Amino acid sequence: MVKPLRLNDRHQQILRATVQHYIATAEPVGSHTLAQEYQFAVSSATIRNALGQLEKAGLLYQPHVSAGRVPSDSGYRIYVDNLLTWSDRQSRTVKQRLENEINGDNWHFEALIQRMGQILAGLSGYIALITFPQTETVQLRHLQLMLLPSHQILIILVTDSYHTHSATLDLPAAMEAKEEGELEQELAIFSNFLNAQLRGKNLSELSHLNWQELDQKFSIYADFLKGLQQQIKPLLQRRMAGPLVVHGVSKVIQQPEFSQLEQVQMLLSLLEQEQDKLFSLLFDPDNYGDNLANLGQEMNLLTGETMPKTRPVVTIRIGAENPLESMHPCTLVSAIYRQQEIPMGSVSILGPTRMVYQQTIPLVEQAAECLSEALSKN
């Protein structure tokens, strides 16, 4: 059973050193190695005791009994959120390097995306994934709510391309005692209200819609509205999108984490056959700014240094935080690029959880900023 552990300075230092050493070597880390290579000013036995406490807390684990420790997904999460820092100067250096690689040429944007993918794969050693700008999006044409005998509400959604989607949601508890005729009349009124609010809107516009204001106008439908939002989003995400730019696969499959054929096959299947699932994960504006890793809020807890809010928000999903099982051995680092505050696409790097986070995160952040600046000039 995992026991909670309040990390003191020593725990933080040993966890940071363990993660960094494992990232660099891909070899389990023992107390003797840490005592020799890092200046902790404590004995090997003290380090060994701290490693045991970190393991009990679920931040490290042993691949087998006689081995050293390696970071768990939770260990990487603590490392990324609390122990990893970099300065504005480092970010400026990364951006300058990207601009030098692009050579300041007057690229067409599609060619720039291809080139940026090559650069990110080359600099990181991982897979670069960039979505093309989403200029054409599916819009909601009509919404209808119907009462079912099972005290559920049938939602029928029709897009501007006349694609139909249906789903059921539970009737709000506050309405269960009402008569059937009264319910049907109220649902008709609510349907008309929702059509007036949502008709003609695409996913980007719905993402910026004040759903809280809708909750206030029809407070008894608050939970229903949350469910409705989740039903609408996947439908409107079926975009008329350009191809997903993918570079760097050959480098990643050389990593020790992908030494087994089955692991390589799962990764290739994800990139070749599950792009629809991957696309919705890469480009969902609502996912950026959630609690997965809002850099500028959580990255510098130890130093107190904050990042400018104007930077692209970088989302980091580590291991099992990824909803697709084929991505559980991986970390996905993503940021949205924009045109005048409108989300247009995303820049991502996909690699093993044993990722050089200190290098990868600024790369994604600054690549998104470069693409946003390029779009603003068009």
From Swiss-Prot:
Source superkingdom: Bacteria
InterPro entries for this protein: GAF-like_dom_sf (IPR029016), HrcA (IPR002571), HrcA_C (IPR021153), WH-like_DNA-bd_sf (IPR036388), WH_DNA-bd_sf (IPR036390), WHTH_transcript_rep_HrcA_IDD (IPR023120)
UniProt cross-references to Pfam families, sorted A to Z: HrcA
Record's keyword terms, sorted: Repressor, Stress response, Transcription, Transcription regulation
Record GO terms (molecular function): DNA binding
Keyword Transcription: yes
The protein's role, per its UniProt record: Negative regulator of class I heat shock genes (grpE-dnaK-dnaJ and groELS operons). Prevents heat-shock induction of these operons.
Family membership noted in the UniProt record: Belongs to the HrcA family.
Protein name (record): Heat-inducible transcription repressor HrcA
